[in-house]
Amino acid sequence: MNTSHKTLKTIAILGQPNVGKSSLFNRLARERIAITSDFAGTTRDINKRKIALNGHEVELLDTGGMAKDALLSKEIKALNLKAAQMSDLILYVVDGKSIPSDEDIKLFREVFKTNPNCFLVINKIDNDKEKERAYAFSSFGMPKSFNISVSHNRGISALIDAVLNALSLNQIIEQDLDADILESLENNAPEEETKEEIIQVGIIGRVNVGKSSLLNALTKKERSLVSSVAGTTIDPIDETILIGDQKICFVDTAGIRHRGKILGIEKYALERTQKALEKSHIALLVLDVSAPFVELDEKISSLADKHSLGIILILNKWDIRYAPYEEIMATLKRKFRFLEYAPVITTSCLKARHIDEIKHKIIEVYECFSRRIPTSLLNSVITQATQKHPLPSDGGKLVKVYYATQFATKPPQISLIMNRPKALHFSYKRYLINTLRKEFNFLGTPLILNAKDKKSAQQN
């Protein structure tokens, strides 16, 4: 640890070769001092420089890569660990475009054992979409990490703030700021927040089930925001409404007939419906309960599953339903068993019954559709589930989950990194999905769960 006689706080940048340590050093120092290239191990010596972070002078150390198979690796590793021991704070940099290997984790834990005043810095997260990759590094066991992109100057400001807080240097010195420091503060200004997304909702169903009536009922009071856009009567029609601060765009798709009856222009309509669903987040499946369900209803419902959409079942014409409530619900549960997670709303579009409930349910389902499970909590639930019902063996060989990571949302997508991913049986996957639904309430939301070995995860 840093000794009391030192006047400057010291920050060491550690990590394996070619993860961006020297680039981060140059970014913080605002000068190209260390050699940077795509060739692993270009930094052999420890580069030192006094720099100013938001007006505070600190000493920054850039170390050689700690790769196991590098030349002079033992000497470099020993030098790095000594630098770690003498520093006040360590920035351990990893490559966010790669899945961590066992060697990554082993080296990090060795550094952390030497000096627990350590930040895990995940570099090369160049845009918001790539943030999903960072969750693979939950296996390092750090409660907080920092996603940055040195080349795009993303996340640097937040990292600097955290560094100053950790070093108890969190009060910016206002006097005697020179031009370079002012420039640094400007360059590291926080990034603008992304604009809130419009919820895209596709209305699907057979012909004459009441899709257009539902659209009219949903947009009756708010349709002045966006006027109807239609090329022909078989084109999807867009309408946007505002619920509180949330915009919702509805797409009324063309009604779908039996395939044998789809000819000419209706084939075009089906293609347009497919394209409309490709950009949708949620599907409203409209079912006509004035008569029994038909096979085509089930086939149309598979469109939502095909496009991995959130889904809400709308039972229209409820005022003239063909059977009592209990009978219809029992039939619905039997015929649409694969949509048991979908909420069901009864309505009469012509009488505007339960229309507000549909609007608010869309927002609720979208929140579930966009949900991200905290990585530590996700792994805790998966661990408990596998302990409660252990994974079946694979020909007498142990099957285990190393860790789980949610790598995407809309819909939630989770990878299980396993020693034998092909041994994950469909029934056990369903058990894990049901467990996650029970714990985290993924209402109306498909959950995608896949199994990978470490090598496959690394390649992705």
Curated annotation (Swiss-Prot):
Q: Which InterPro entries match?
A: G_ENGA (IPR031166), GTP-bd (IPR006073), GTPase_Der (IPR016484), KH_dom-like (IPR032859), KH_dom-like_a/b (IPR015946), P-loop_NTPase (IPR027417), Small_GTP-bd (IPR005225)
Annotated KH-like domain ranges read 371-455
**Which residues does the UniProt record annotate as the domain EngA-type G?**
9-171, 199-370
Question: Which residues span the membrane?
Answer: none
> Is Protein transport tagged as a keyword?
no
Q: What range does the record give for the signal peptide?
A: none
Keyword tRNA processing belongs to the record: no
**At which positions is GTP 1 bound?**
15-22, 62-66, 123-126
Annotated keywords: GTP-binding, Nucleotide-binding, Repeat, Ribosome biogenesis
The record's listing under HAMAP family reads:
GTPase_Der
Functionally, this protein is described as follows: GTPase that plays an essential role in the late steps of ribosome biogenesis.
Q: How does it assemble?
A: Associates with the 50S ribosomal subunit.
What is the name of the protein in this document?
Answer: GTPase Der
Q: What is the lineage of its organism?
A: Bacteria, Pseudomonadati, Campylobacterota, Epsilonproteobacteria, Campylobacterales
